Amino acid sequence: GVDKAGCRYMFGGCSVNDDCCPRLGCHSLFSYCAWDLTFSD
């Protein structure tokens, strides 16, 4: 994910990883942001 205004938090709707906030990635099956298993950028 990326640190930008309007980024989606956990379980926020998304279409690509960059829709999500840092350390979150877009879950391909459910189309929401989920933790990408990282602890740092």
From Swiss-Prot:
Q: Which SUPFAM superfamilies match?
A: omega toxin-like (SSF57059)
Whether Secreted counts among this entry's keywords is: yes
Cysteine pairs bridged by disulfides in the record: 7-21, 14-26, 20-33
| GO molecular function, a single term | ion channel inhibitor activity
- A cellular component term, taken from the record's GO annotations: extracellular region
Keywords carried by this UniProt record: Calcium channel impairing toxin, Disulfide bond, Ion channel impairing toxin, Knottin, Neurotoxin, Secreted, Toxin, Voltage-gated calcium channel impairing toxin, Voltage-gated sodium channel impairing toxin
Per its UniProt record, what InterPro entries does this chain match? Huwentoxin-1 (IPR011696)
Tell me yes or no: is Disulfide bond among this UniProt entry's keywords. Answer: yes
Domains: entry comment: The presence of a 'disulfide through disulfide knot' structurally defines this protein as a knottin.
Q: Which family does it belong to?
A: Belongs to the neurotoxin 10 (Hwtx-1) family. 56 (SNX-482) subfamily.
Q: What does this protein do?
A: Toxin that blocks vertebrate P/Q-type (Cav2.1/CACNA1A) and R-type (Cav2.3/CACNA1E) voltage-gated calcium channels. Also inhibits sodium channels (Nav) in bovine chromaffin cells by delaying sodium channel inactivation.
Q: What is this protein's record name?
A: Omega-theraphotoxin-Hg1a
